[in-house]
């Protein structure tokens, strides 16, 4: 079972994320692998681009980002030839310790933390992502 591209962390209730990992654990056969991929909150905080604009044809996208507590907030403004839309995305700024604790609470055995699918070792100061490789006990 895989949860890639920060598929967790969008609910205001952290227990929703735990329930998702618990459900994945139930679905796994003994000895099977679970992979969880989330943004490294420390890097997001450090390298946050507060605002940028981009054009896609005639459509202008303005993205504003900020961190409030342990949440990364992205405010997306879309202007399509005078018709405006606004979307707000909120995602949890994960730490490796939070990911490890969630894996352990689900009863999985953490094998490794990496900085993405290339399996470079996770470094809390430089890794863009936290990828947990965990196995369901036999």
Language model: regions and residue ranges:
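A short, flexible beta-alpha/helix-coil linker loop
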Residues: 7-9, 82-83, 118
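SAM-dependent methyltransferase
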Residues: 15, 35-102
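A short glycine-rich, Lys/Arg-flanked "PGG" loop and its adjoining helix->strand segment in the class I
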Residues: 16-33
């Amino acid at each position: 079972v895989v949860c890639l591209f920060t598929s967790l962390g969008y609910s205001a209730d952290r227990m929703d994320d735990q329930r998702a990992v618990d459900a994945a654990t139930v679905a796994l056969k003994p000895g099977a692998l679970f992979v969880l991929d989330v943004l490294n909150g420390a890097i997001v905080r450090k390298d946050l681009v507060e605002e940028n604009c981009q054009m896609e044809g005639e459509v202008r996208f303005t993205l504003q980002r900020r961190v409030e507590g342990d949440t990364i907030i992205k405010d997306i403004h879309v202007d399509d030839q005078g018709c405006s839309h606004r979307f707000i995305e909120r995602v949890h700024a994960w730490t490796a310790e939070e990911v490890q604790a969630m894996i352990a609470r689900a009863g999985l055995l953490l094998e490794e933390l990496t900085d993405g699918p290339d399996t470079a070792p996770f470094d809390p100061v430089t890794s863009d992502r936290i990828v947990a490789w965990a196995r369901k006990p036999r």
